[in-house]
Amino acid sequence: DFKLQQPQSSVVVIKGDTLTLNCTASGSGPIGAVKWVKGWGSDNQTVYEHKGSFPRVMRAVPDPTNDFTIRISNVSLEDAGTYYCVKLRKGIVDDVVFTRGGGTEVSVHA
């Protein structure tokens, strides 16, 4: 049974600091990547995925591992929001969401 654990339900970070978002996977799931999104629904934005360039974001532990914790450097007030760790299932055309973590609500203080 595959699960994504996001141990922090909420985090407070100071503007300009580095934000750490924790996510670990347990169990075996389908083939597919894990990515991070901010928000949920039609207006969510991808914060980090394996392919693509995300200059302020890096994985805390390099591949391959079941730890998908990321660090976002030089946090701005616009970074406030709820972040989800998302497991994708590889599809023929597009990857589809298999499961997601419980979400971490991020507050940024100036």
Regions found by a protein language model. Give the residues of each.
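N-terminal edge beta-strand
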Residues: 1-22
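Extracellular beta-strand/loop-rich beta-sandwich domains predominantly from IgSF
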Residues: 9-11, 55-80, 90-92
